[in-house]
């Protein structure tokens, strides 16, 4: 499933890890227990996205590497949102308001 529906699945997985005490060894759960570490990972991954994009535009990197770094950023951003109790749907609503799109029903 290589489309936006996977984001809902990713969000569900992050919530499941948060709510499952037996998942204590899960990387996601470790990040949720250490919000400062999760925030640092967002900053780190954002920098890596910028570096990969710069390298790609200079012909020194690949689209695949940029996509990999972007995926890491999205994952870590979702973890930060989950730790703060902010659902992706709240972010989607802000984006839709900014771009004048009608709200979609049933977004996570």
What is the predicted function of each stretch?
Residues 1-70, 74-108:
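Flexible "arm" and connector segments at domain edges
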